[in-house]
Design a protein with these regions (language model features):
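Active-site acidic-Proline motif in GNAT/NAT acetyltransferases
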Residues: 86-88, 92, 120-121
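Short, charged/polar, Gly/Pro-enriched secondary-structure boundary elements
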Residues: 153-160
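Conserved GNAT acetyl-CoA-binding A-motif
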Residues: 106-118
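Well-formed, non-transmembrane alpha-helical positions, independent of function
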Residues: 17, 127-128
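Conserved beta-strand-loop-alpha-helix junction that forms the acyl-donor binding cleft
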Residues: 116-126, 142-144
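Acetyl-CoA-dependent GNAT
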Residues: 3-81, 86, 101, 105, ...
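Conserved acetyl-CoA-binding loop of GNAT-fold acetyltransferases
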Residues: 129-139
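Conserved acetyl-CoA-binding loop-helix of GNAT-fold acetyltransferases
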Residues: 91-104, 130-131
């Protein structure tokens, strides 16, 4: 199944599919809707890296990173900003694919770690991120716990498909 997954740029042709993605109801307070993420990306184009996750011809998720190498807070040098997997597509490895793809992009950019922040507690994504190698740092951004995952910078990867 994972071989069918790919990341695509958000375009005029697929923006409606992006905005139609909905997480489970118990997750709605934990991650911003895709439309909000796209507004953030529009206002911060120099750092935002938004991508739709496709399985075949169907949009099944959305991932957005921030790459801000000059930011005073190193968390934002390579940061998993948003991850929205459609409710009916969760538990199928799509989130893992998105995070691993983002790690590849971060490594291609020469980064040594990927950061994420999340709401901890019931229904929160902490367990998911820990299974992917993220460890809490003890820091918080607003009311979200920060976790990091080490990555190894690699030679340039062909990211033209992303």
């Amino acid at each position: 199944m994972l071989a069918e997954l790919r990341l695509e740029l958000v375009t005029q042709q697929n923006v409606r599919a992006a905005c139609a993605l909905k997480v489970r109801p118990d997750q709605e307070g934990l991650v911003a809707p895709v439309a909000f993420s796209l507004a953030d990306a529009y206002t911060m184009p120099d750092i935002a890296w938004p991508r739709l996750i496709y399985q075949g011809d169907q949009a099944v998720g959305f991932v957005m990173a921030a790459f801000a190498p000059d930011h005073q807070n190193p968390v934002y040098h390579s940061y998993l900003w948003r991850l929205n997997i459609g409710a009916e597509h969760q538990g199928k490895g799509i989130g893992r694919f998105a995070v691993e793809s983002l790690c590849q992009e971060a490594a291609r950019r020469g980064n040594h770690r990927l950061s994420v922040s999340y709401h901890s507690g019931q229904h929160g994504p902490e367990g998911f991120y820990r299974r992917l190698g993220f460890q809490p740092t003890g820091a918080y951004i607003q009311d979200e716990e920060v976790a990091e995952r080490p990555i190894s910078p690699i030679a340039a990867v062909d990211s033209a498909r992303w």
